[in-house]
């Protein structure tokens, strides 16, 4: 009796919510399509005639970008699946991948690279097809700017050539089993020039801008002509020899004419040395172009944010300045030389203090503008008279001892252990902006957890991370996930700025005017040193130099600070940057201090007042 079975084609990645993890690969394809070749017989044939079917052949099914299951579930994009396989191969820890497809990125407000970069991608991919393979399907995946300091890997497909649903944005997110798994996989991928994924018949080129992997170039290669001929030969029917007489059928063993199933894995086209070199150079060109594009967009965003912030600070200065002018006119009109009212003098002092505080914030805002960074180039720094600056700074310290930005190095040190150290000046206003649906968190618990997590990684890099002993347990009006993301940006930026043997100190305490104060100090280069390389100048010539430590340092500092500021300011927090933090340090080695002023949760404030 002949049993007919039709095996439905089921794709492993057809479920968009399916998580991929590191597992031992099955030697047989995970999604075979079982086909019974033509073995037709009439329905009226007698039971004495027996038909021997041929062996089952495994057919690898290549999924197109638009293909889906009959049930309606979306399949995983082939290029994304190839990247996932390459990352799993480079990772020493389990990795789970999820895929999302945004049909309209304008409504979801997903930030994509500039149109200039996307046009450059199309030109480079067209060059790839001309030189390497004219039938290759090429895709470019890049990492968004805010993902470099996270424990997960996020990739977005920005270009697919030839275009297949060009308006769709494919987002691939990889979650690593341990926080350090991403860094280890990134280091392994950075050392590889190309990864061949036979399962998907693709070549994955990491786009590396040391020390980061900024994206991937995926080339899905066509089937070789020899493979097509073999498949056609296997699919040809064998005609009369396929049907045996009853005597022959009973005379032969059952396995005599039955071929065992053969597993044929797809092969990847072998590049010539010249094609391989061209492909690697194209991936490097795209990596460098993406870095410059991100820096340009970061500068535009930072400049816009600083312009908004500066306009608000100017309005804050205008009120006290008008009051001071009015009081000055009153003094000149109603008093004689030796008859100055004490109340008027006190008002002048208060208004002067407000202007001083606002000017400090204005200085911090101006410190990171594009014009300021470009202005502090290498030639200008060489002309700085160090002795003159130190003399002028010492005069300011004696004249205005309550200026928080001019505190001496002993007061700025968090490791001194002095309980009576002078506190920085608080901001003018510190209140939560989102009163509703905020779940408060304990800042000390968050800092303790993050320091314990980052400490092993810092030790492997020969750096030290310390949390102040007198860190207070305080409730702040900031969501814990947002606070963790902002702090991870700032702490990792501080670690990247320090040299081997460097130190990062973190302290949290109660702010003088309410709320919490978190101080992050590092002993790395200060902003005067980090801005001397034209590091944020778009299309700067220094990007082609070999020693790019300062460039990466500044890029991560500004990127991390921008991300943290955008997150925390939405909760009413204030971020201040003091660089150099040590006035008596050598030129360029003054370190950086980052102050985070976090508003307290209203319930915590009322409990503190009752106590």
From Swiss-Prot:
Recorded phenotype for the gene knockout or disruption: Abnormal regulation of psaA gene expression by light variation and reduced plastoquinone (PQ) pool. Accentuated superimposition effect of light leading to PQ oxidation. Increased level of non-photochemical quenching, faster pre-steady state kinetics of the 'Kautsky' transient. Up-regulation of chloroplast-encoded photosystem and non-photosystem genes.
Keywords: 3Fe-4S, Chloroplast, Coiled coil, Iron, Iron-sulfur, Kinase, Metal-binding, Phosphoprotein, Plastid, Transferase, Transit peptide
Span of domain Histidine kinase: 312-602
Cofactor: [3Fe-4S] cluster
UniProt GO molecular function: 3 iron, 4 sulfur cluster binding; kinase activity; metal ion binding; non-membrane spanning protein tyrosine kinase activity; protein histidine kinase activity; quinone binding
One annotated Gene Ontology cellular component of this protein: chloroplast
Keyword Iron-sulfur listed: yes
Residues annotated with Phosphoserine modification: 188
Catalytic activity: L-tyrosyl-[protein] + ATP = O-phospho-L-tyrosyl-[protein] + ADP + H(+)
Residues spanning the signal sequence: none
Main location (coarse class): plastid
Region (Disordered): 17-50, 385-420
Subcellular location: Plastid, Chloroplast stroma
Record field: compositional bias (Low complexity): 40-50
Enzyme superclass (EC): transferase
GO biological process, one term: protein autophosphorylation
Biological function: Sensor kinase that senses the plastoquinone (PQ) redox state involved in stoichiometry adjustment of both photosystems (e.g. long-term adaptation via transcriptional regulation of reaction center genes of photosystems I and II) and state transitions (e.g. short-term adaptation involving reversible post-translational phosphorylation of light-harvesting complex II, LHC II), thus linking photosynthesis with gene expression in chloroplasts. Autophosphorylates, probably on a tyrosine residue. Probably phosphorylates SIGA/SIG1 in response to plastoquinone redox state modification.
Name of the protein in its database record: Chloroplast sensor kinase, chloroplastic
Gene coding for it: CSK
């Amino acid at each position: 009796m002949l049993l007919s079975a039709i095996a439905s084609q089921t794709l492993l990645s057809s479920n968009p919510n399916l998580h991929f993890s590191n597992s031992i690969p099955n030697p047989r394809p995970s999604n075979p399509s079982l086909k019974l070749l033509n073995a037709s017989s009439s329905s009226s044939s007698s039971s004495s005639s027996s038909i021997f079917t041929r062996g089952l052949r495994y057919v690898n099914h290549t999924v197109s970008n638009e293909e889906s299951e009959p049930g309606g579930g979306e399949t995983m994009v082939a290029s994304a699946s190839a990247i996932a396989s390459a990352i799993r191969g480079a990772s020493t820890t389990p990795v789970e991948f999820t895929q999302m497809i945004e049909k309209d990125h304008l409504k979801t407000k997903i930030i994509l690279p500039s149109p200039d970069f996307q046009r450059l991608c199309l030109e480079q991919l067209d060059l790839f097809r001309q030189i390497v393979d004219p039938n290759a399907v090429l895709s470019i995946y890049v990492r968004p700017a805010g993902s470099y300091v996270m424990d997960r890997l996020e990739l977005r497909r920005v270009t697919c050539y030839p275009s297949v649903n060009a308006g769709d944005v494919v987002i691939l997110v990889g979650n690593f089993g341990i926080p350090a798994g991403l860094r280890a996989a990134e280091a392994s991928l950075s050392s590889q020039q190309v990864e061949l994924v036979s399962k998907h018949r693709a070549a994955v080129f990491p786009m590396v801008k040391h020390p980061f992997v900024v994206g991937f170039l995926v080339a899905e290669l066509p089937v070789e002509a020899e493979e097509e001929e073999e498949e056609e030969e296997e699919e040809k029917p064998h005609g009369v020899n396929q049907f045996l007489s009853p005597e022959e059928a009973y005379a032969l063993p059952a396995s005599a004419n039955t071929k065992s199933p053969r597993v044929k894995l797809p092969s990847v086209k072998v590049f010539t040395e010249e094609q391989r070199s061209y492909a690697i150079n194209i991936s490097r060109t795209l990596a460098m172009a993406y870095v410059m594009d991100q820096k340009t967009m970061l500068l535009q965003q930072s400049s816009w944010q600083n312009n908004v912030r500066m306009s608000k600070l100017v309005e804050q200065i205008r009120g006290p300045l008008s009051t001071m002018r009015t009081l000055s006119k009153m003094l000149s009109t109603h008093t004689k030389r030796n008859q100055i009212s004490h109340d008027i003098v006190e008002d002048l002092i208060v208004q002067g203090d407000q202007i001083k505080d606002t000017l400090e914030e204005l200085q911090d805002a101006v410190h990171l503008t594009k014009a300021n960074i470009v202005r502090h180039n290498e030639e200008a720094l060489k002309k700085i008279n160090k002795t003159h600056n130190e003399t002028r700074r010492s005069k300011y310290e004696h004249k205005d001892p309550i200026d928080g930005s001019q505190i001496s190095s002993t007061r700025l040190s968090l490791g001194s252990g002095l309980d009576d150290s002078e506190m920085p000046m608080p901001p003018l206003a510190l209140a939560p902006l989102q009163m509703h649906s905020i779940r408060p968190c304990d800042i000390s618990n968050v800092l303790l957890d993050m320091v314990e997590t980052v400490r092993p990684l810092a030790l492997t890099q020969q750096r030290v991370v310390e949390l102040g002993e007198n860190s207070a347990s305080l409730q702040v009006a900031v969501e814990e996930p947002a606070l963790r993301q902002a702090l991870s940006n700032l702490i990792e930026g501080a670690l990247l700025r320090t040299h081997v043997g460097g130190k990062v100190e973190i302290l949290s305490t109660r702010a003088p005017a309410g709320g919490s104060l978190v101080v992050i100090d590092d002993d790395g280069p200060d902003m005067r040193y980090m801005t001397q390389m034209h590091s944020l100048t778009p299309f700067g010539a220094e990007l082609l130099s070999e020693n790019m430590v300062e460039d990466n340092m500044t890029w991560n500092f500004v990127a991390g600070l921008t991300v943290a500021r955008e997150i925390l300011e939405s909760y009413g927090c204030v971020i201040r940057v003091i660089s150099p933090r040590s006035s008596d340090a050598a030129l360029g080695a003054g370190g950086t201090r980052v102050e985070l002023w976090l508003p307290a949760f209203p319930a915590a404030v009322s409990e503190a007042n009752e106590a």
